[in-house]
Amino acid sequence: MKDPRDIIKRPIITENTMNLIGQKKYTFEVDVKANKTEVKDAVEKIFGVKVAKVNIMNYKGKFKRVGRYSGYTNRRRKAIVTLTPDSKEIELFEV
């Protein structure tokens, strides 16, 4: 099993994700190879909260070109973690 800090890369803090916090939904960028169970265990271990469900979205890399050199940006994976109603808040997202 991977270290939880290798699975959760960083929180995604945007206007849209801040609106979801009222519904106890938190958004993280996660490892591309991580599955829902690994993300759930990592969030519970790092933040000490109870997770109800995990939704995951995959983003493919964009085509970029600089002069005659071309390539793709790295692909990404985003997880929206929903906490149980009796779970405490994650302090990282407090404003």
UniProtKB/Swiss-Prot annotation:
Alphabetical UniProt keywords: Ribonucleoprotein, Ribosomal protein, RNA-binding, rRNA-binding
Residues annotated as transmembrane: none
One of the protein's GO biological processes: translation
GO cellular component term, pick one: ribonucleoprotein complex
InterPro entries (UniProt xref): Nucleotide-bd_a/b_plait_sf (IPR012677), Ribosomal_uL23-like (IPR013025), Ribosomal_uL23/eL15/eS24_sf (IPR012678), Ribosomal_uL23_CS (IPR001014)
Disulphide-bonded residues: none
GO molecular function term, any single one: rRNA binding
Superkingdom: Bacteria
Subunit field text: Part of the 50S ribosomal subunit. Contacts protein L29, and trigger factor when it is bound to the ribosome.
Family per similarity comment: Belongs to the universal ribosomal protein uL23 family.
Annotated function: One of the early assembly proteins it binds 23S rRNA. One of the proteins that surrounds the polypeptide exit tunnel on the outside of the ribosome. Forms the main docking site for trigger factor binding to the ribosome.
This protein's name: Large ribosomal subunit protein uL23
The species this protein was found in: Geobacillus kaustophilus (strain HTA426)
